[in-house]
Amino acid sequence: MSIVKEQFFQRVEQHLHAIYQDVELPIAISELTEELITLILGDNPLRDPTPHTNRWDEQDVVLIAYGDSIINHEDSDLAVGTPLEAPLKTLHRFIKEQCDHQLNALHILPFYPYSSDEGFAVMNYAHVNEALGDWQDINAIAKDVKLMADLVINHCSSRSIWFENFLTDTHPGKDYFKTACLTDDLSQVVRPRTSPLLNTVTTTSGEKHVWCTFSHDQVDFDFENPEVLKEFVGIIRHYLDNGIRLFRLDAVAFLWKQLNTSCINLPQTHEVVRLLRTLIEHAEPSVVIITETNIPNQENLSYFGNANEAHAIYNFALPPLLLHTLLSGDSTALKHWMMSMPPAQNGTAYFNFIASHDGIGLRPIEGLLQPSEVASLVSTTMQFGGRVSMRTSHDGTHTPYELNIALFDALQGTHNGADKFGLERFLCAHAIMFAMEGIPGLYIHSLLGTTNDYERFDNSQHNRAINRHRWQESKLLAAIAEKYSHHHQVFNGVKQLLAVRKRQAAFHPNATQFTLHLGEGLFGFWRQSIDRQQSIFCIYNISSQPQSLTLADLNLINTQQWYELLSKTVLDEELKTMQLAPYQTLWLSNRA
C-alpha cells in the first residue's frame, strides 16, 4: 500500500470512528472504509490533493437556475405545455449565446425526477428528469462551464423506490429512514417548517412514525445506518462521472438526528461533511463542496471547520442585511457584520448571493438586526407584493422565517414606499456583491430582472413560487433586446459589472478585504490583490439622497494614479471630494 493510500485509509477510518462511536454497526469500521474507498474511486486512480488550494479566482461567477427556467415553446406568451426541445438545451444555448462569457459556472437546481418542492423531494438520484433532458445534456453543459449540482442528502421523496421498499420492509430502503415514537420528547428539535415533525405510515411490519424535517413528502434519512452513507458515496461517484465539479450539500445541517438535542449542527453532521470532503478530494481534487446551511451566522461559519469541511459556505446573512441597508439607507448593520466576518483561509471561500430560488432567509440575521428592523423588512416586503413564510419556534409561536419576493420588486423603493430609483438600487446591490470577498452566485431572475410571478404563486399556493418564473425563450429574448425595458437595462447592467469585475485581481475571492467607515449613507470597503499589486476602494451610496465622499477618508497613495473602473475615468490629483448620486457605485483602483 502506498503512503498516500495508507494515509487516505487512516483518515477515512478516523472519520468513521467519530461518526459511529455511539452506534453498533453490523460491519467493522475497516470493512466500511474499504467499501467507501472503492465506491468513491470506481475505476479511477487515487489522487493526492494539495491542501489549502484555492480552486477559484476573480473569473468565477456562478449562475443559479432551474433546468427549465427558460423554455423553448411555440406559444410566445406561455411557458407551458411540451417544449420544442429539452429545456437543458435551451438553458445551455442562452448561456453560450447571450451571456458574453461573463458566467463560467452554472448551478442547475435539482434536475432529478421529483414529487414536490420543485425538485427537492428526489425520487431517483441516478436519473435526469425526462422533462428537462438527459445525462447527455448535463455532460454537454459540463464541457462549457463548471457545473454545480445538488446533493439532496437529508431526505428524499416519499414516492422514491427506497421509501416504497421501507413500507414493504424490503431492501434497499428497509432501514434507510429515521423513525421516532410519539412519546419521544421532540421539543428541542429545530426545524424551518410548521408542519408536524412526524408522519405516521403503515408498513408491512406495522405502524411507524417517520421523521420529516421539511414536509411529509420529504422523509429524512437515518445516517446511523451505514448503508445510507454508502448509497450517497455511490451517488457522488455517479455525479463526478457526469461532469459535476461543485456539490451543494442541501439542508446538510439537519443530517444527524439524536433525541434530546436540537438535531441541527450536531458533531456527527460536521464529521460526515469532513468525511465526504476527504473522499471526494482524493477522487477529484478540483471539486468544490458548498454547504447549504440557512442558520444563524456563527453556526454557518462553523462549516468551514479548520479548512477541512466545506470549501465554501453560503453567505446567508448577506441577502437580508443588504436588503435592510438599501431599504433603510443606513449601512451600520451591514458594516458591523462585514467587520465581524473572519477572512476565509486559503482553500475556503464565501459563496455570496443576494437572491435565490428560495426566499430571503431571516434566521441568519438573528442578533444582527433589531426586531423592529426585521419587522420593517417584513412590512415592506408585503407592501411590495411579496409573501412571508413562517416557522414554529420552541414556544409554539409562528415566527417569520423567509421573505418571498423577486429581488427586483423588493428593491423598487425604500421603507417609505416605491420610488424612481429601483433600477439604480438593484444594480448597486449587485455591485456590492460582485466586489466582496467571496465567489458570487447570481440567480437567473436577478440577471433578467424578473418580477413577482403571481400566476405561478396562485396556481401552486407555495410562497416560493413567486420568485420561480419560467420564461418562454422568444419572449425573454424580446424583453432583453428592447432597450427601454428594465429587463434589457438589468441584463446589460449586470453583465457590464461582471465584465469589469473579472479583470481585477483585487476581486479574487481570497483577496484582502477591509471595511471602511464613511457614515450611514455610504458603504465601502477596500480590496487588495493577493500579490499586493492592485488596490480597489469600493464605495457605494446606499441611500436615495446624494452623498459626498471626502477622498482624504481613503488611503489613496498620492504617488500613484487612480482610476474609476466603471466610468473608465482618471481621478484628478487635485480632487478633494466626490459627489455620489443615489445608489451610485465607485470602484477606485490604482490599476486601470
Stretch-by-stretch model annotation:
Residues S2-A592:
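Active-site and adjacent substrate-binding regions of carbohydrate-active enzymes
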